[in-house]
């Protein structure tokens, strides 16, 4: 008796659940058009426009313009004084007799008409000349890193600052090494002397991106030999008069 009552109650509960589920599914199937509030014609027009938007909304492939590339060279710069210009990892610039030193490799990047940037390959720093004629190394490319490249009458190449020169005479300031292989102040170097004469010895031709030009004195990522001090190159006083 108790079992029959329990069975009957179970069947009633099951039927109630099934009827409720049927009503819910029926209500889902009967989505009355009247609830939309729009006519059949309006819905048709909206459907057409949605398809049009979908088709026209496809993104066309963007054609990227090729980045401007500059053809430069990896080279060694051999001075008539008998030294190769070199840049150490800490940014120190001097000369060495060791032709095979990796520190003598420089990127010569054209940045204007007969104007180049001289960048140490290993240090990734630029050779620069400040307003007092001292050479230093820079993390960023500034106007002080631009050098005019000229061929002298004896077929040696000379590099002069594009930014600074003698105010009275207008004489250019040159990159130079003295007889001891030390760098010289640019305003002490004369283009007629061996100290300013270099022979580029190209290793390979490379393509470079144009360096981003920064303002002079802009904060650099790493501390380097600062401009405006006579104790450049790790505390060695630059010999200003030796040629």
Curated annotation (Swiss-Prot):
Ranges where the record places region Disordered: 1-39, 216-243
Motif (Bipartite nuclear localization signal): 11-38
Primary location recorded for the protein, binned into one broad class: nucleus
Subcellular location: Nucleus
Alphabetic keyword roster: Disease variant, Epilepsy, Growth factor, Nucleus
GO cellular component, one term: cytoplasm
A Pfam family hit: FGF
Effect of residue 114 to H: In DEE47; increased function in positive regulation of SCN8A voltage-dependent sodium channel activity
GO terms (BP aspect): adult locomotory behavior; cardiac muscle cell action potential involved in contraction; cell-cell signaling; chemical synaptic transmission; heart development; JNK cascade; nervous system development; neurogenesis
GO molecular function terms attached to this record: growth factor activity; heparin binding; sodium channel regulator activity; transmembrane transporter binding
Source organism superkingdom: Eukaryota
CDD domains: beta-trefoil_FGF12 (cd23328)
Resulting phenotype, residue 114 to A: Gain of function, affects voltage dependence of SCN8A fast inactivation
Entry comment describing in which tissues the protein is expressed: Brain, eye and testis; highly expressed in embryonic retina, olfactory epithelium, olfactory bulb, and in a segmental pattern of the body wall; in adult olfactory bulb, less in cerebellum, deep cerebellar nuclei, cortex and multiple midbrain structures.
Disease: Developmental and epileptic encephalopathy 47: A form of epileptic encephalopathy, a heterogeneous group of severe early-onset epilepsies characterized by refractory seizures, neurodevelopmental impairment, and poor prognosis. Development is normal prior to seizure onset, after which cognitive and motor delays become apparent.
Family according to the record: Belongs to the heparin-binding growth factors family.
Self-association state and partner proteins as the record states: Interacts with the C-terminal region of SCN9A.
Function: Involved in nervous system development and function. Involved in the positive regulation of voltage-gated sodium channel activity. Promotes neuronal excitability by elevating the voltage dependence of neuronal sodium channel SCN8A fast inactivation.
Protein name: Fibroblast growth factor 12
Originating organism: Homo sapiens (Human)
The encoding gene: FGF12
């Amino acid at each position: 008796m108790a079992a029959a009552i329990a069975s009957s109650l179970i069947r009633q509960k099951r039927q109630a659940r099934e009827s409720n589920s049927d009503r819910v599914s029926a209500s889902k199937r009967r989505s009355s058009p009247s609830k939309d509030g729009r006519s059949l014609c309006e819905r048709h027009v909206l459907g057409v426009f949605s398809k049009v938007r979908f088709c026209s909304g496809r993104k066309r492939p963007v054609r990227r313009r090729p980045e401007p590339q500059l053809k430069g060279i990896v080279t060694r710069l051999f001075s008539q004084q008998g030294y190769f210009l070199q840049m150490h990892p800490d940014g120190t610039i001097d000369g060495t007799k060791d032709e095979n030193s990796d520190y003598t490799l420089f990127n010569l990047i054209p940045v204007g008409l007969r104007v180049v940037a001289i960048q140490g390959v290993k240090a990734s720093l630029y050779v620069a000349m400040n307003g007092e004629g001292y050479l230093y190394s820079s993390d960023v490319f500034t106007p002080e890193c631009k050098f005019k490249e000229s061929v002298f009458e004896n077929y040696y190449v000379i590099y002069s600052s594009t930014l600074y020169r003698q105010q009275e005479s207008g004489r250019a300031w040159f990159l130079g090494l003295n007889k001891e292989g030390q760098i010289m102040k640019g305003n002490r170097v004369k283009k007629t002397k061996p100290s300013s004469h270099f022979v580029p010895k190209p290793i390979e031709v490379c393509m470079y991106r144009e360096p981003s030009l920064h303002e002079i004195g802009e904060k650099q990522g790493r501390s380097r030999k600062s401009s405006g001090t006579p104790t450049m190159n790790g505390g060695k006083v630059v010999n200003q008069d030796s040629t």
